[in-house]
Amino acid sequence: MRAVYILAMACAATLQASSSALPSTKDLNSQVESLVPSDITDSAHVGGVRLLRVEDKEEETEEERGFGGALADGLKKLNPAKAAKKAKEKSCEN
């Protein structure tokens, strides 16, 4: 029974804290209006065409992401057929 009360209090505290963290809609609208200057909106349209994104074609660099390159190189070195052949040659020498 105590667990139910503790859970209810935790939910109530979470909801109260999350609702007090949000600004009121009246304040939010005034902040949005003050943050949109006309020069930003005009710069999105050039020559009657809306610019969504600018790409730099000069530098096309490819990045290695994650462990893909190192993992592939390591897997190339791990060839079980070569390892078995080397082990067989080593055992024949002894």
UniProtKB/Swiss-Prot annotation:
Up-regulation conditions: Expression is induced during host plant infection.
GO cellular component: extracellular region; host cell cytoplasm; host cell nucleus
Organism domain of life: Eukaryota
The keyword Chaperone belongs to this UniProt entry's keyword annotation: no
Record motif RxLR-dEER, residues: 50-65
Family statement drawn from the similarity comment of this UniProt entry: Belongs to the RxLR effector family.
Annotated domain remarks: The RxLR-dEER motif acts to carry the protein into the host cell cytoplasm through binding to cell surface phosphatidylinositol-3-phosphate.
Functional description taken from the UniProt entry: Effector that enhances P.infestans colonization of Nicotiana benthamiana leaves.
Name of the featured protein: RxLR effector protein PITG_15972
